[in-house]
C-alpha cells in the first residue's frame, strides 16, 4: 500500500513539474511580445503559477519522504 502511495505522489509531482516547465516556456514567449497591460497581466499570472507549482512540488516531495 505504501509503495502505491509513493508512486501516486511521484506521478503528481511529475505533473506539477511538467506544468511548471510549461508555464516557464509561456513566460519566455510572452516576454518577447511588445509591452502591454495584457502582456504584463499574463506574465504575473504565469509567474504566480510557477511559484505555486514549485511550492506544490516541495510539498509533495516532503510527503513522499514521510511515506518512505
Predicted regions and their residues:
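Residue-level detector of functional hotspots within protein domains
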Residues: 1, 36, 45
Amino acid at each position: 500500500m505504501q509503495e502505491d502511495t509513493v508512486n501516486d505522489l511521484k506521478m503528481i509531482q511529475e505533473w506539477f513539474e511538467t506544468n511548471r516547465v510549461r508555464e516557464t516556456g509561456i513566460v519566455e514567449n510572452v516576454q518577447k511580445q511588445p509591452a502591454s497591460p495584457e502582456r504584463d497581466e499574463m506574465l504575473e499570472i504565469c509567474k504566480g503559477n510557477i511559484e505555486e507549482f514549485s511550492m506544490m512540488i516541495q510539498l509533495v516531495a516532503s510527503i513522499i519522504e514521510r511515506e518512505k
